[in-house]
């Protein structure tokens, strides 16, 4: 259910701005998006797993807050990230 270390490293390398960048908004949103996809697949199979559902809601909320921050501070970067991750914007 959790992201494997290799997959997380791959996502970080794809979205980081430099070698030391592991915590920028871009990286955090990309990692959260992948975790949300995994949790969604899990919840389709396990409909009564309410603890995982709560975790999903938490991750979606955190990603929403990060995207709102990015939208307010750098609109072009926000649009690029949304299109690259294939997310809908609000």
Swiss-Prot record:
SMART domains: Ribosomal_S15 (SM01387). Pfam families: Ribosomal_S15 (PF00312). The keyword Hydrolase does not apply. The keyword Acyltransferase does not apply. Coiled coil: none annotated. This is Small ribosomal subunit protein uS15. Transmembrane segments: none annotated. Keywords: Ribonucleoprotein, Ribosomal protein, RNA-binding, rRNA-binding. One of its GO terms (molecular function) is rRNA binding. NCBIfam families: S15_bact (TIGR00952). GO terms for biological process: translation. InterPro entries: Ribosomal_uS15, Ribosomal_uS15_bac-type, uS15_NS1_RNA-bd_sf.
């Amino acid at each position: 259910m959790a992201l494997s270390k290799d997959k997380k490293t791959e996502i970080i390398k794809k979205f980081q701005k430099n070698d030391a960048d592991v915590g920028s908004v871009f990286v955090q949103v990309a990692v959260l998006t992948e975790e949300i996809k995994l949790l969604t697949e899990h919840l389709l199979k396990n409909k009564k797993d309410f603890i995982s559902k709560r975790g999903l809601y938490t991750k979606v909320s955190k990603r929403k807050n990060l995207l709102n921050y990015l939208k307010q501070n750098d609109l072009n970067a926000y649009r690029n990230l949304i299109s690259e991750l294939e997310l809908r914007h609000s």
